[in-house]
Amino acid sequence: MKLAREFYARDTREVARDLLGKVLVHRDGGVRRAARIVETEAYHGPDDLASHARFGPTRRAGIMFGPAGVAYVYLIYGTSHCMNVVTGAEGFPSAVLLRAGEPVEGCLHSTRGPGNLCRALAIRREHDNGRDLAGDDLFVEDAPPPRERIVAARRVNVDYAGPWAERPWRFALEGNAFVSRAPGEWRAVRGRRR
């Protein structure tokens, strides 16, 4: 069963945790590809100096200011696509970066890291940016709560963001082999063991 738009219309940090264990599905050219989400990062509001929204509704990040439940796909380093899901209330820019997945079906190659996840599921900015996640081509399927403990750490590659870089808004399923980076300073998320 597909996640409803209401799932995304909540605090981005809650959505980031609650996406863990759900299944990201992309149907492209008659092929279904899917991966279980095992790592996410939350980007919360215009004051979050690690967020693309810190510069306002630019051509790239304007989608973050829109309705929840939409894909925000962008290109980094000129080669890798990254997928976020827009969250929260319209007008308050927030999104969850999907950092890594565990292959479920039809994945083309590695799903460790946001660029690899998009490559494995054939998710591309030119086709999928702005796509409604309540549609039939790109969506997240509900799944039973994960058995693994949810852990948190600082986000990756955001040292430029000052104190915002230290926020523990990167979430993962503890011990999952598909988490994209070495754990570093992981800590358990209170009340989130399922």
From Swiss-Prot:
The keyword Nuclease does not apply. Coiled coil: none annotated. Its EC number is 3.2.2.-. GO terms for biological process: base-excision repair. Keywords: DNA damage, DNA repair, Hydrolase. The keyword DNA damage applies. It comes from the Bacteria. It is an enzyme of class 3 (hydrolase). Pfam families: Pur_DNA_glyco. One of its GO terms (molecular function) is alkylbase DNA N-glycosylase activity. InterPro entries: Formyl_transferase-like_C_sf, MPG, MPG_sf. NCBIfam families: 3mg. Belongs to the DNA glycosylase MPG family. This is Putative 3-methyladenine DNA glycosylase.
